[in-house]
Amino acid sequence: MKTMKKLWILMAALTATLLLCVISASACTMVYVGSDLTADGSSFMARSEDYSNGYNKIAHVNQHGKYAAGSVYEGCYGFIHTFTHDSYAYTATSDDNTSGVCPDCGQTHPHTPMEEVGSNEKGVSVSAMVTLSPNGTVVNADPMEDLGICESDMATILLSEASSAKEGVELLLNIFDTVGAGEPSGVLIGDQNEIWYVENFTGHTYTAIKLS
């Protein structure tokens, strides 16, 4: 009996120690499950955001036409995009800026902060992004662009504009080619027919792989 009591005390102490430990993470995790691994042949993509608890999340619905054709969107860090058509409706999760100040960039101009995951009315889903770390040699050869597209803006633009996963991939690659990337990224873009993984480590160099 005394042995069991000591064991429970030890377990309680270990649990308390683990709960008191603060583990700081600054990254995200994406999951892809191919059709060959599921019972019904479906493919899955998912994500978790592993970051500090100071960034509350809001799940919301963006109505069709929130961004009108020809309107200009300015993102967190200066990336600018002109919409080619009235934006598609989509659901997404973003950081909470209901106070009027973006918790990510500290700016007050209208934009959606870190809208990193969502699905639109055409069945396109985006997970943007996972954090990557390039070496200095490749970045020196092909530097990031100060006003390039960043994690904070990818899902907003792709879900508003793309009617298929492939169209979303083509749009993102065109942005990399013409405007450039503001940071390295790994992005999943999918629909009911296929899922793509797009990765860049420099401003204009990338790879796009069709996973399913």
Task: Name every feature range the model reports, one short phrase each.
Residues K2-A12:
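Bacterial N-terminal signal peptides that target proteins for export
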Residues M11-V22:
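Bacterial N-terminal signal peptides
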Residues I23-A27:
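Membrane-interface motif at the C-terminal end of an N-terminal transmembrane signal
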Residues C28-C150, L171-S212:
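A contiguous strand-loop segment
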Residues S152-D153, K166:
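A structural signal for well-ordered alpha-helical segments within the folded catalytic domains
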Residues A155-E161:
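Short, well-ordered beta-strand elements within core beta-sheets of diverse protein domains
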Residues E161-E167:
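Short, charged, surface-exposed loops that flank catalytic or proteolytic processing sites
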